[in-house]
Amino acid sequence: MKPYTQTTGLVAPLDRANVDTDQIIPKQFLKSIKRTGFGPNLFDEWRYLDVGQPGQNNSKRPLNPDFVLNQPRYQGASVLLARENFGCGSSREHAPWALDEYGFRTVIAPSYADIFFNNSFKNGLLPIILPEAEVDELFRQVEANEGYQLSIDLAAQTVTRPDGKVLGFEVDPFRKHCLLNGLDDIGLTLQDADAIRAFEDGYRQQQPWLFR
């Protein structure tokens, strides 16, 4: 997992509340257990005017010109600004996979569904919670200023606006440690690889009949 330290990125405003995981990545694209291949179908039912299918050539599909991610001013955005209860619905881990592969490293919203929130940290995506009033102000500023960027410093737990105003956010210390060091569940386990091997060797000597 790629470490998350400091980043400055273009902000895309998704002005919708209660965005569920089926809207983030529709169910027909969930047949793969790989972590890749989901970015092109992020928000598929909103980005395109037709119904997408796995393996389809998206370059030939008709785009929805009104959807925010299809607007030229938001191309290359790495910060997604959202409304309350983002990521609700089913527990599919494909949702943060799709957001990450599309290019988003950060989501900012007033609240999240618990499972999506937890899955995001485990997959290198930082879900920042800010008060609703601060999120409202960010929406106003993003929509009024083309090329609007935010600077996020995970170590300092700050979001800095272009006007210099600094917004603080809370994050669990363990989750912060994992993101800063690029540690997913596998990475955490591998940190104890020597101890695991030592235990297995000792157990094999104590209970040899189990390994015959």
From Swiss-Prot:
EC number in record: 4.2.1.33
Keywords of this entry: Amino-acid biosynthesis, Branched-chain amino acid biosynthesis, Leucine biosynthesis, Lyase
GO MF terms, alphabetically ordered: 3-isopropylmalate dehydratase activity
Ligase keyword on record: no
Domain of life of the native organism: Bacteria
Enzyme class name: lyase
Name of protein: 3-isopropylmalate dehydratase small subunit
Species whose genome carries this gene: Pseudomonas aeruginosa (strain UCBPP-PA14)
Encoding gene, per UniProt annotation: leuD
